[in-house]
């Protein structure tokens, strides 16, 4: 399902700030697998996820996902196949947009978007139903700006958004690290 073959990435090449972030990294992940990458700060865990997500292009090697060679695909194209939740609960959402608008964007990820209304009656009903599965009472607050929510609520919504279209791969980058213990427990429960 995911095959990473010999990828390498060096930042700031030929400068005093040159950093070899990834060197000849390879792994195979079968469909339905769950992989945890453990390492010290600065060891390249987030960099590896960024490489898979397409935040930057790797210097060498290849990345294949669900039978597609995605090594040179831009990030927005990979978004059709990859859902992602960042460590910072404020990174996965647009704070000035409503909960409904954020979710509508997630529901249309990977498709062309026109300038018409993102949330109509049929979409609103689906949003409400899915948000209610979080058991946080947010289904009654769909018009609230997402920026007014707690970190735990935002992270739960980000997880819902990342998994909305059943991605081939879901990347979770220390997705509970910035949360209080109660919120972290709620988000971990949703992850399962």
Give short role names for the model-derived ranges.
Residues 69-83, 91, 113-120, 124:
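ABC ATPase NBD coupling module
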Residues 162-163:
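ABC ATPase C-loop
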Residues 96-112:
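Q-loop/switch helix immediately C-terminal to the Walker
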Residues 1-4, 10-24, 36, 74:
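A short, flexible loop at the N-terminus of ABC-type nucleotide-binding domains that lies
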Residues 38-40:
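The feature captures the beta-strand-to-loop junction immediately N-terminal to the Walker
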Residues 61-69:
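Conserved ABC transporter NBD signature motif
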Residues 53:
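Helix-to-loop junction immediately C-terminal to a conserved catalytic motif
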Residues 174-175:
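Walker B catalytic motif
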């Amino acid at each position: 399902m995911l095959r990473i073959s010999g990828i390498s990435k060096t930042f700031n090449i030929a400068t005093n700030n040159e950093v070899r972030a990834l060197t000849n990294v390879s792994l195979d992940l079968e469909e339905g697998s769950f992989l945890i990458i453990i390492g010290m700060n600065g060891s390249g865990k987030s960099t590896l996820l960024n490489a898979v997500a397409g935040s930057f292009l790797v210097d060498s090697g290849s990345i294949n996902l669900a039978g597609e060679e995605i090594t040179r695909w831009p990030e927005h194209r990979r978004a059709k196949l990859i859902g992602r939740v960042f460590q910072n609960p404020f990174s996965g959402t647009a704070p000035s947009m409503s909960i409904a608008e954020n979710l509508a964007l997630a529901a249309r990820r990977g498709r062309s978007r026109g300038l018409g209304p993102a949330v109509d009656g049929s979409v609103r009903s689906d949003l409400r139903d899915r948000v209610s599965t979080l058991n946080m009472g947010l289904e009654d607050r769909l018009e609230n700006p997402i920026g007014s929510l707690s970190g735990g609520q935002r992270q739960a919504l980000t997880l819902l958004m990342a998994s909305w279209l059943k991605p081939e791969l879901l990347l979770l980058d220390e997705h509970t690290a910035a949360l209080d213990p109660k919120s972290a427990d709620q988000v971990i429960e949703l992850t399962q």
